[in-house]
């Protein structure tokens, strides 16, 4: 049987890595030949989950067409967030929980997008629908994905379905979701050894908002000041990225996982749109965004509206 590659977005987060592994596991148990792969480096939070549940990181790839004809996308659909040669392969399936944008195919496909907080929540349903048992290690990775995307169930993206799925998966994995989850998030929030280049690319996504080209990066921390004291370095590197990619705006969202607030650092010609979107005033290119923790639900929609005005 012809091999299929399954992958999430560039600059992978925990949901992207763990959902690729989980969906490949399900597809293989259903008789397919699927391999999970990744499009970037594994972050500290994800590595914690992989190590805890004794799972290998997926293989790193830059292109797919040199290996396979068909691919499956998890945790994303927008072309600019996907593999470099996405136009040269057939997208067979998409399993996602984000907005649909900049996406079209030449062939029909299986497309499943649900308004839940995490791709792994959808996959939990799919295991059940196919009467396939979830192994302990896979359950642990799927739980990790939900905890990551929902910030331990505190994010506004978190739904009752995510909470219910996490409860089921924690039982299979044999862990206490709260205790394990906090340790995992803290592992991801240790930014002390990260370069500024790493900080702005750990979890960065590019969007087309109206006619504007925008990159939004997010980092989690237990102390915003730890990141803010590197502001001069961050601004220098971000300005370089803005010039290289011809961006209208680069927004770095520094999220305090304990206080559930974020600090925005905005660089680019359209930085004023951040003020409009959040009804804040940028001082020295930064503003506190009270209660904002979700890029998907609290940042992208309001910025999209602001860019359209």
Swiss-Prot record:
Binding site residues for Mn(2+) 1: 9, 13, 75
Entry-linked InterPro entries: DDH_dom, DHH_sf, DHHA2, DHHA2_dom_sf, Mn-dep_inorganic_PyrPase
Keyword Nucleotide-binding included in the entry's annotation: no
Predominant cellular place of this UniProt entry's protein: cytoplasm
Catalytic reactions on record: diphosphate + H2O = 2 phosphate + H(+)
Source organism superkingdom: Bacteria
Enzyme Commission number(s): 3.6.1.1
Cofactor(s) essential for the protein: Mn(2+)
Binding site residues for Mn(2+) 2: 15, 75, 97, 149
Subunit structure as annotated in this protein's UniProt entry: Homodimer.
Protein family per UniProt: Belongs to the PPase class C family.
The name this protein goes by in its record: Manganese-dependent inorganic pyrophosphatase
Species assigned in the record: Bacillus subtilis (strain 168)
Gene field: ppaC
